[in-house]
A protein has these predicted regions:
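Hydrophobic core of transmembrane alpha-helices in multi-pass small-molecule transporters
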Residues: 20, 92-93, 103-118, 231, ...
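Residue-level signature of mid-helix packing/kink "hotspots" within the transmembrane helices
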Residues: 27, 55-63, 150-151, 273-281
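Extracytoplasmic gate region of multi-pass secondary transporters
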Residues: 27-36, 215-285
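Intracellular juxtamembrane helix-capping segments at the cytosolic ends
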Residues: 36, 118-131, 138-139
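Helix-to-loop junctions at the C-terminal end of transmembrane segments
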Residues: 61-76, 279-291
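Cytoplasmic membrane-interface "Motif A"-like loop-to-helix N-cap segments
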Residues: 71-86, 288-300
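C-terminal ends and interior cores of transmembrane alpha-helices
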Residues: 87-100, 301-315
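Helix-loop-helix hairpin linking two adjacent transmembrane segments in secondary transporters
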Residues: 142, 146-193
Length: 319
């Protein structure tokens, strides 16, 4: 087992699976909004505040969670932080399944945000450390698990909600996902000195790794430029992700059958998550070859075109 867990490709695979297990927290949320609103009589805006709380905790706690991993060390850190994340993920969705008040829903969102962030920060950080020679590809593959993971469960979640209610979907998927993450956590670790050998891979892009203290990072203009860029890009994507079921309903295409009995919303969610996953390693691979700046320009431009099309032609099921 020691030899297996020392293999960087195994560690990358385990991290990807963990990311798949937390994908529903973000990309499956839209399936629960309308059923919750109908069952509880809550306003959609109040329900979506829970999603905002989830995103805030998922992202803002990652520096702390990454710091804890480093403090605990390469062997214990990933195990303990990801295991804790799995517990929080399960507790959050189980609480959502029992929530009869918005306060309880918000607490559940906070728990899942903290848990999801712990898994995300650890798995992405580990990918960078195991693959200093292929950072873009490794991070892209890891993030692909998060992006595409929900594609596997869109149809099952909708089926459970239709048959047993959204509470059952929250409970069983939350319990299963959290348990899977918890079990995988004990196989994770980060590289020890000497575990990662220099790669002979020839790249057309010079990749530089330099250690910078948090204080120096925070006073660097380039950090704040990148931060603002990623906030804007992520916010636009998350707004579409969280509201896509409601957008489809407003366009009156939600239940339109496209092919083989699959509705527009189901196909949209599956395709969106699959492409979300495939694009991450692809652009990571591209960035290792043409550079991060050119890659971001291409990706951000494509995103802008997609949001424009959603606004002007979204009433067509195929669009």
């Amino acid at each position: 087992m020691t030899k297996l867990t020392s293999n960087r490709w195994w560690q990358l695979t385990a991290g990807i699976i963990c990311m798949v297990m937390i994908a529903n927290l973000q990309y499956g949320w839209t399936l629960f909004v309308a059923p919750m609103s109908k069952a509880q009589g809550w306003a959609v805006s109040d329900i979506q505040l829970a999603f905002s709380i989830f995103i805030a905790l998922e992202t803002w706690l990652t520096p702390l969670e990454g710091w804890i991993v480093d403090k605990l060390g390469p062997k214990r850190g990933p195990k303990l932080v990801v295991a804790a994340g799995g517990i929080l993920v399960a507790l959050g969705w189980i609480l959502n399944s029992q929530a009869n008040s918005l306060t309880a829903l918000y607490i559940g969102a906070a728990l899942t945000g903290a848990g999801g962030g712990a898994v995300y920060a650890t798995c992405v950080g580990s990918a960078v450390k195991w693959f200093p020679d292929r950072r873009g590809l490794a991070v892209g593959l890891t993030a692909a698990g998060f992006g595409a993971g929900a594609a596997l469960t869109v149809i099952p979640i909708r089926a459970v909600i239709a048959a047993s209610g959204y509470q059952a979907a929250f409970f069983w998927f939350g319990l299963g996902q959290g348990a899977f993450v918890f079990m995988l956590a004990w196989l994770l670790r980060q590289p020890m000195p000497g575990d990662v050998r220099a790669s002979a891979m020839v790249s057309s892009v010079i990749q530089v790794a330099r250690s910078v203290s948090p204080g120096k990072m925070l006073v660097s203009p380039i950090f704040w430029l990148l931060y603002i860029m990623f906030v804007l890009v992520s916010a636009s994507g998350l707004m579409a992700t969280a509201q896509i079921a409601l957008i489809a309903k407003d366009y009156n295409v939600s239940d339109s059958v496209l092919f083989l009995g699959a509705t527009t919303l189901t196909v949209t969610l599956v395709v969106d998550n699959v492409m979300n996953g495939l694009a991450r390693p692809f652009f990571g691979w591209i960035s290792d070859r043409i550079g991060r700046e050119f890659t971001m320009a291409i990706a951000f431009g494509l995103g802008g075109v997609a949001y424009w099309l959603l606004g002007v032609a979204g009433s067509s099921p195929l669009t």
